């Protein structure tokens, strides 16, 4: 499954970012941050079409030798970025899509929490558990 | 028919390949036609319908015409498609039956037999007709016969296999037609053949593919078969279809690799797992890389070979399809997947070999694309290429690190060996690029050859990549590459070049709030700055890093120690200051004592701040200081008081907002929306035009975000100089919260603003440039003040009231013997009580002491001795004052009580309703601190309001006085008395009040009644004064005697002159009045006295021996119980004699059943219009009277008079009414008319059928 999952605010600062293994955390931070370039590009390229078709999934942002970075953007321009190991060939587009949808649902739940301040870092345990379930378990 | 044993040599695969069509028969004929044929055939496209539901395509056909040979026909099992003859044509121009029978028929038969033997059914016989030939031979058969014969002989059921081409070399319309028919036929047959043969081929191929699970199946064999199909499609210019073949092969192979990874290995795949020995990259410059193809054919290809070949074919086709950007994209995918596949298949690869392969391939793809696109195209599609650039750069970098080209000392022998091995794997340069100077091969070889060359190539690549990223707006990617470059520079010991890139990247990360990259980059920057010797920057970065929680404890300690050791080193160099922004510590809150942060001059103020140190270890600070800005503001106290309620918590603690460094500053510093509603009204009629919400701080919200320049505070911080500094020396800041208290004695009055917080460690000064929100304290100096205010809401006149004196000493110190001198006012007494105490409070409202007041009164002055009190204290005491009721007015003007001023107020207040009458007393006070007197006005309210009224019972008269208590207090009334002021001897007032003492509650009234008797008729006017003693009901004992409350009034004309009596009688014969039926109303007006003085007015008519006066009566029923039928009013002449009675009869109709009150009968004096001056007056009085009633009376008048004119002979009066002078009505004074039937009721019973009663009264 995913090795890094990030939720990024409209203003491009991370609301939530988790990666595994933790040693390469920094690398993933750089990777996710860089991928925002492509996210921005795709959003502006899609422009109105995106709004009309309500297609939130941005697809593969860019592949690297070892990882594939996928993107997803909500209507409020909150971005989800997921990094998947390239060697994990079992993950097809459809699986990625459904993972994003799951992530989006969980994020919506977080936003619905009246005690959550939009724009704050996400510290919800439920969200954390969900993300954990989508990441590789390092044993 | 012996077929040659040797397999046919491979055809040269170039784009010149065309489908093969064989020609048999008359070769000379064909040669003559060939140029036209080859030119005409591709001219028009033909629709190719495809099997398997594939979309039909328009296709331009071309053919390679070759002479028919039996060897050309494929043998059984030969899968070659490129050499496959798709159509066989036999040419003849025979027109002679004899010749046909002799030679042509045999030849045709032989040809047909060969075709049949190879089961080829795609053939065509062309008969060329030539008019010229026909003319030569006269006995020729009709031309059709030869064709018929051929058709008959060879084309059984397939007559379309024989076509006629007439005069092919002429330029006539018939020729054209015949050509067209022929070409169409030829194209159709060719396509039929394609469909059939390709279909068959595809079927075979599919069959072969389905066998892939069988053990002996070989991917390479299958590859060659499917590629054959791809070739044919390519030959037919169907590049899309050709590409599909390769994509299918690609997918098939990829799937096998994936399956292999999942443990499902195919035997043939193990062959591809042989160790990589050659990594010479992709070759894209030839349409077909025959070397690699041969390797595949021989089943000797490695994974990289297969992939390279496959991609080179895909690349070629994509370029034919004008899709170069897809090449770039696919190339990147290919390179990534190859690396992955090699890993997955666990192929042994020498270190660096793949890097070489990827590097070469990237450059090869880029060069290939650049070779076929122009500059503009490339520039607009950088986004597709930049990935390859950055990949190539990455690989070159890792090669550089691998071969020791990045290290300072250069490569060692081990590195060199590795380099040699890598170069060996490249093999020799390929011939097609040998002459290109910038070939990937040469580049790589050069880059690996020396440290300098590597640096050059690496920098070239990096800069190109950064430039490309920047140009397409991928700033983040550009920054990341820049950071890599910075790392490279750091290794090359050129930190000055690295700094720029690090700063750029750091700014980017800070702006977007990415904590981890910020920390990492900052760490690199710190190292860079240290190398550069930028001490201030380094210390600043260090202080940031020392307080960065993303670093380990050790790292933070290290950076903290760096600062401290710098500080200790520089101690011997006094005067040199290093000013740094304070980032290691955060100001958390600030606490003032006194809490309101207001202190009087000379007072002591304490400021306690809480500073959160983020340092990992305790830091000893030489001094902590707060720079204070002083400004003189005159209105400081009030401003501060207002400000306090707004900004400061009541406990004097100011909390500074936590700056979460995680979020970008742009996010934090944005103020909240300040929305307010906006209504815009039209200026003319004030109607609402627009409404909306406006944002008041748009300028704050929408201003352009400075691109992070303000995020990293500029190092050029200045220490503010100022005389006012709060200091605290030698403080050790522990990690976490530290409380530091500053104490200061206030000096000059004014506002002090806390500006800078700074902490010094040796020569290092940490400065918090601005304390935000603004923190201020105020020092004030106050003039002494005296306040006098009533203790209750309002002071009541007549009873003792408490007044509070407040002396605010300000800067004045009250000495022993200081006193307030109050000038006495006549009507206000200051009551001196024995137990008056003064209380002294401190500035913060704490009670200090109490003292007895010394009050000394003289005639004019009351002196109050003040207790001693220090400056900025408050003395409070209370005094009782009594406002005496104003002296009763003397003399003849007795109708007006009190002073004129008072009277006016009374009038006003009566009009306003229940307001109390007030009197003001002005007291002038001399204070010891001032030479001027203070004048204080005290307002007292009279608690009562009094009204009188005259009551009649026949001829007996009563005076009623109503006293209303308007205050909130209850009073006890006593000794009520009504006294005739006129001292008329023949008038007597007999009180009917029993109680001498009476309680009057708040907002309630008490009535007093006296009967008025007189001895002489008519009685004179009564002028009297009402007085009543009062005291507050709650007070038990009053020390002073209170003056009674008085009220003066006058009663006149109270003698009864007329008695009115009304009676309602049922209709004659009826027992009761009934609703709806007429009843009679009898009104009798009786004169009770003879002519009196009061009757002597204009209405008086003197005729012969008796006097009469004119009266008007009017029957009014305000409650609509009665309908008056006929006229309701009339004028009567009343004789002025005792017991003279006038009776009026009227008809009224009850409208309701029940006990109904009688209608009112009103009596007016009817004044005629005698004189001109009277009429003038009249006009005024008409107006002054209720105009509505005037009109009404006028109508009545007319009505009455017309009626009267019928009854009597007063015809003149009617004409007079039209003139301007009109008669007027005057109400009789209340006492003169007594209505004896007031309050009487009459019983009305409902009529039997009065469910609905309609009465219309006109």
From Swiss-Prot, chain A:
Keyword ATP-binding: no
Keyword annotations of the record: Cytoplasm, Endoplasmic reticulum, ER-Golgi transport, Golgi apparatus, Transport
Keyword Transferase belongs to the record: no
Subcellular localization(s) per the UniProt record: Cytoplasm, Perinuclear region; Endoplasmic reticulum; Golgi apparatus
A single GO cellular-component term on record: cytosol
Annotated function: May play a role in vesicular transport from endoplasmic reticulum to Golgi.
Subunit note: Component of the multisubunit TRAPP (transport protein particle) complex, which includes at least TRAPPC2, TRAPPC2L, TRAPPC3, TRAPPC3L, TRAPPC4, TRAPPC5, TRAPPC8, TRAPPC9, TRAPPC10, TRAPPC11 and TRAPPC12. Interacts with the heterodimer TRAPPC3-TRAPPC6A.
Family statement: Belongs to the TRAPP small subunits family. Sedlin subfamily.
Name the record gives this protein: Trafficking protein particle complex subunit 2-like protein
Source organism: Mus musculus (Mouse)
Lineage: Eukaryota, Metazoa, Chordata, Craniata, Vertebrata
From Swiss-Prot, chain B:
Entries under InterPro entries matching the protein: Ig_TRAPPC10, TRAPP_II_complex_TRAPPC10_C, TRAPPC10/Trs130, TRAPPC10/Trs130_N
Classification via Pfam families: Ig_TRAPPC10, TRAPPC10, TRAPPC10_1st
Domain of life of the native organism: Eukaryota
Keywords: ER-Golgi transport, Golgi apparatus, Phosphoprotein, Transport
One of the GO biological process terms: vesicle tethering
Basic and acidic residues: bias regions: 901-911
Positions of the UniProt region annotated as Disordered: 888-913, 1201-1222
Disruption phenotype: Gene-null mice have smaller total brain area compared to wild-type animals, with specific reductions in the size of the corpus callosum, regions of the hippocampus, anterior commissure, and internal capsule. Only white matter structures are affected in mutant mice. There is a loss of myelination in these regions, but oligodendrocyte numbers are normal.
Record localization: Golgi apparatus, cis-Golgi network
A GO CC annotation given for this chain: cytoplasm
Low complexity: compositionally biased ranges: 1201-1214
Primary location group: Golgi
Modified residues (Phosphoserine): 707
Quaternary structure and partners: Specific component of the multisubunit TRAPP II complex, which includes at least TRAPPC1, TRAPPC2, TRAPPC3, TRAPPC4, TRAPPC5, TRAPPC6A/B, TRAPPC9, TRAPPC10 and TRAPPC14. TRAPPC9, TRAPPC10 and TRAPPC14 are specific subunits of the TRAPP II complex. Interacts with TRAPPC14.
Family classification: Belongs to the TRAPPC10 family.
Function comment: Specific subunit of the TRAPP (transport protein particle) II complex, a highly conserved vesicle tethering complex that functions in late Golgi trafficking as a membrane tether.
Record-given protein name: Trafficking protein particle complex subunit 10
Protein source organism: Mus musculus
